[in-house]
Amino acid sequence: MSTIPNDLKYTKSHEWIRLEADGTLTVGVTDHAQAALGDVVFLELPEAGRVVSAGEACAVIESVKAASDIYAPVAGEVIARNDSVTDAPESVNADAYAAWLFKLKPANAGDTSALLDAAGYATEIAD
């Protein structure tokens, strides 16, 4: 059974989103996603300053099984990326919720209302 923290938001494409006090968003992949992928061996993250649209493929995660796109949960500007996970991609498997990938400044703060809560994501992955 996958871990699904209640204090995060989620997408149907298996990204988790933490709403920070300053209005920015921290993005990573869910425990469910890392378990399905298997051993993560490579990450390609967006550069700071990149402007992304909601749902745009903006990063790549590769495992021994597959390569998958990571999507921007909302429109905005990438303000930081976690280079420590590119140096140690296995950290995503060790703790998917500590191994954040990038931070976004949303173009519109209200855009997060379309994201799933923990119960909604649990229902989504139960199918």
Swiss-Prot record:
Keyword annotations of the record: Lipoyl
Named cofactor requirement(s): (R)-lipoate
User: Would you tell me the Gene Ontology cellular component terms?
Assistant: cytosol; glycine cleavage complex
Residues forming the Lipoyl-binding domain are 24-105
Does the UniProt entry include the keyword Protein biosynthesis? no
Q: Which Gene3D superfamilies match?
A: 2.40.50.100
Self-association or partners: how does it assemble?
The glycine cleavage system is composed of four proteins: P, T, L and H.
Name by which UniProt lists this protein: Glycine cleavage system H protein
Q: Which organism is it from?
A: Azoarcus sp. (strain BH72)
